[in-house]
């Protein structure tokens, strides 16, 4: 197969590819289009999901990983006919895949924000709000406790294979949201409200026991300073509050880990109802 302009320097690579036996550029172009479409849903998720979409993971790695996953699932997907892929509906298919992947990543971000919110409230109650630094995930300032909680949640998430479960659910979502078949996406929109419910409920479960104990510590410090006025409230109460906060967090590690595990289970159930069982969600 020869291409016009063989002697031209404009398309030497294309001409060399056309000279290879058994290789049609139309087939190569179609394969690249299919690979791109298969990678869009996973790639959009990796860009918007927590940890995967953070600045700690370079964009090039996320793009390569999404194309690798797209190549892996390419043979198992049912694609529309070639005329649909090369027609105006291709734009709608691309937008559909991006919408589904970004929605799943946004849902995970909202749910993962529960530990950040819990850390901010604990830091404000214990006097550790001043101990803040740049958050590598969002780029803004956040308390150190929030960042420790977030890293702890990431460790628990990977330890229970949550990342593999979520990626598996995204793969199964092609059965309920096939390529090129535009159905109702009301479940994807309502998933944000369910994620917000998980956000505040999980944050309250994590925060309330620690904050209540710190409240009793502050009440005890108030009685002590009231009975002994010579004690300075700031020189005595502030260190005692910090020590109490550290002790409470130290002895609450197991309980916090179980709370994080329940949060991850709620996230998996929400994503499952969103992608795999939309009719039951």
Q: What are these model-derived regions, one by one?
A:
Residues 2-281:
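Hydrophobic alpha-helical segments and their helix-loop boundaries in membrane
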């Amino acid at each position: 197969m020869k291409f016009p302009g063989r002697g031209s320097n404009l398309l030497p690579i294309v001409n060399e590819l056309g000279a290879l036996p058994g290789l049609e550029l139309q087939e190569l172009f179609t394969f690249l289009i299919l690979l791109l479409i298969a990678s869009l849903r996973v790639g959009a998720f990796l860009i918007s999901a927590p940890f995967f979409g953070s600045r700690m993971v370079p964009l090039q790695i996320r793009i390569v990983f999404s194309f690798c996953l797209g190549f892996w699932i390419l043979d198992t997907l049912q694609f529309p006919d070639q005329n649909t892929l090369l027609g105006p509906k291709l734009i709608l298919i691309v937008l559909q895949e991006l919408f589904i992947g970004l929605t799943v990543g946004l849902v995970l971000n909202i749910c993962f924000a529960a530990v950040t919110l819990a850390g901010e409230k604990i830091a404000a109650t214990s006097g550790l709000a001043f101990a803040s630094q740049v958050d590598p995930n969002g780029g803004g300032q956040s308390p150190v406790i929030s960042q420790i909680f977030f890293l702890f949640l990431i460790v628990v998430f990977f330890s229970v294979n949550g990342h593999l479960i979520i990626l598996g659910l995204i793969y199964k979502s092609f059965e309920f949201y096939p390529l090129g078949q535009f159905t109702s996406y009301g479940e994807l929109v309502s998933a944000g409200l369910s994620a917000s419910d998980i956000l505040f409920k999980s944050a309250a479960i994590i925060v309330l026991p620690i904050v209540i104990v710190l409240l009793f510590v502050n009440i005890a410090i108030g009685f002590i300073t009231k009975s002994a006025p010579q004690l300075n409230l700031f020189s005595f109460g502030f260190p005692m509050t910090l020590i109490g906060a550290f002790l409470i967090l130290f002895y609450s590690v197991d309980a916090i880990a179980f709370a994080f595990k329940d949060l991850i289970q709620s996230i998996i159930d929400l994503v499952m109802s969103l992608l795999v069982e939309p009719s039951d969600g």
